């Protein structure tokens, strides 16, 4: 065990609330009084009294950490809203700097203050931020009976949230807009999404949502295998039952990256990302119309950060980051596709390919004989009317090849 670095951190993050300097603790005040340079948003810097003599700098527009990091090692204070490590600049800095270079002095977050005002148990609430993020990210969080705390991007966010809820059939949901939490201008506005009439709130606001589904609400469960009707497509869709099996075989885990090669309408990548907020996916699709379907579906189903690559495999794969899993829903007979996918797959990763035609089945059988893996055939039948009776209507059988790339061997220990 090594001792911690004794060098004091050069960067101090001070969380500040709407109550400004008087609301800070002793450590935070001392840090600001001793600082030679303070960086923050103009609104936050204006909360400091004249006794703080440090040079003050606002963040550049558009926002960037580069000017701050260019002075790495020079003692600096950064002002942040509430808890800097909760949807704040602290989280961004922590991804680029080791913990030994940071000292964080948090204040109560607006999420904590909102939970206190509403009497909600914070650990039972879904918390998310729309600050510089697409509104569509909210779609994956809307479920009957669920409570949400949403950090707004600006004063237009509450009305936009109400419109989204209405479009999903959640007009009965109760909204509470909490403005300037913790400050002298604090205000609360309540109403139903279906009756929301406030055109614009204060820019600094948080929206609390109690989700209530109406009779026509669109239900989007978290398990794989969403209804086929949830997708806009031209027929190039991995059908619901096969999709559920495919996702189970791909086995998404937090933080993992998927390539969806020949993505069609994007269903596999979308449901991969819905498995956990940190899951990532890249959809590779050459057809222009299907690319539009992917853009629509990723927003409608709450994963707007799904990355779409317009192009054909294998050429479109060459510059992409290495994936933890790959799904090939079409194109296994195209020259070089399987070879490139297998080469780029991380050690220990999973590759799953589906085939319908005899030609594509032959390719999968050849790969299975060379590399092993699981070869499975799925047959799905649905009851359909036939005259005055019902009969089973068989869908085209699907052949699945599941391969796992051997993990990299650890070097032997020295004797």
Curated annotation (Swiss-Prot):
GO process annotations (BP): cobalamin biosynthetic process; methylation
Catalytic reaction equation(s): precorrin-6B + 2 S-adenosyl-L-methionine = precorrin-8X + 2 S-adenosyl-L-homocysteine + CO2 + 3 H(+)
Molecular function terms, GO-annotated: precorrin-6Y C5,15-methyltransferase (decarboxylating) activity; protein methyltransferase activity
Pathway annotation from the record: Cofactor biosynthesis; adenosylcobalamin biosynthesis; cob(II)yrinate a,c-diamide from precorrin-2 (aerobic route): step 7/10
Domain of life where this protein originates: Bacteria
Keyword Transferase: yes
Keyword Transferase annotated: yes
Entry EC no(s): 2.1.1.132
Keywords, comma-separated and alphabetical: Cobalamin biosynthesis, Methyltransferase, S-adenosyl-L-methionine, Transferase
Pfam families: TP_methylase
SUPFAM superfamilies xref list: S-adenosyl-L-methionine-dependent methyltransferases (SSF53335), Tetrapyrrole methylase (SSF53790)
NCBIfam families noted in UniProt: CbiE, CbiT
Family: Belongs to the precorrin methyltransferase family.
Protein name per its UniProtKB record: Precorrin-6Y C(5,15)-methyltransferase [decarboxylating]
Organism encoding this protein: Pseudomonas aeruginosa (strain ATCC 15692 / DSM 22644 / CIP 104116 / JCM 14847 / LMG 12228 / 1C / PRS 101 / PAO1)
């Amino acid at each position: 065990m090594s001792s911690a670095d004794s060098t004091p951190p050069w960067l101090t993050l001070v969380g500040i609330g709407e109550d400004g300097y008087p609301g800070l603790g002793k450590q935070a005040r001392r840090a600001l009084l001793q600082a030679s340079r303070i960086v923050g948003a103009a609104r936050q810097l204006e909360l400091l009294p004249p006794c703080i003599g440090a040079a003050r700098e606002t963040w550049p527009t558009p926002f960037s950490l580069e000017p701050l990091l260019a002075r790495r090692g020079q003692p600096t204070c950064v002002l942040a809203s509430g808890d800097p490590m909760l949807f704040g600049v602290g989280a961004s800095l922590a991804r680029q700097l080791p913990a030994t270079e940071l000292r964080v002095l948090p204040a109560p977050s607006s999420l904590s203050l909102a939970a206190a005002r509403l009497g909600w148990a914070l650990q039972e609430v879904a918390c998310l931020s729309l600050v510089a993020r697409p509104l569509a990210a909210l779609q994956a969080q809307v479920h009957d009976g669920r409570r949400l705390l949403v950090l707004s991007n600006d004063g237009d966010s509450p009305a936009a949230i109400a419109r989204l809820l209405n479009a999903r059939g959640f007009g009965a949901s109760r909204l509470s807009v909490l403005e300037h939490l913790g400050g002298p201008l604090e205000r609360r506005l309540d109403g139903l999404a279906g009756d929301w009439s406030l055109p614009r709130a204060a820019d600094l606001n948080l929206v609390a949502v109690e989700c209530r589904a109406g009779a026509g609400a669109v239900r989007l469960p978290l398990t794989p295998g969403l209804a086929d009707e949830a997708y806009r497509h031209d027929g190039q869709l991995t059908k619901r039952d096969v999709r559920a099996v495919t996702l189970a075989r791909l086995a998404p885990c937090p933080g993992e990256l998927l390539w969806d090669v020949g993505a069609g309408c994007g269903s596999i990548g979308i449901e991969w990302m819905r498995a956990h907020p940190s899951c990532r996916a890249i959809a590779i699709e050459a057809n222009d119309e299907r690319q539009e379907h992917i853009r629509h579906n990723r927003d409608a189903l709450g994963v707007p950060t799904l990355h779409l690559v317009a192009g054909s495999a294998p050429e479109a794969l060459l510059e992409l980051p290495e994936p933890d899993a790959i799904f090939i829903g079409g194109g296994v007979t195209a020259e070089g596709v399987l070879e490139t996918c297998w080469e780029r797959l991380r050690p220990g990763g999973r590759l799953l390919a589906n085939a319908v035609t005899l030609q594509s089945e032959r390719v999968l059988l050849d790969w299975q004989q060379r590399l092993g893996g699981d070869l499975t055939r799925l047959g799905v039948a649905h009851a359909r009317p036939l005259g005055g009776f019902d009969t089973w209507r068989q869908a085209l059988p699907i052949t699945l090849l599941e391969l796992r790339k051997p993990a990299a061997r650890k070097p032997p220990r020295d004797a």
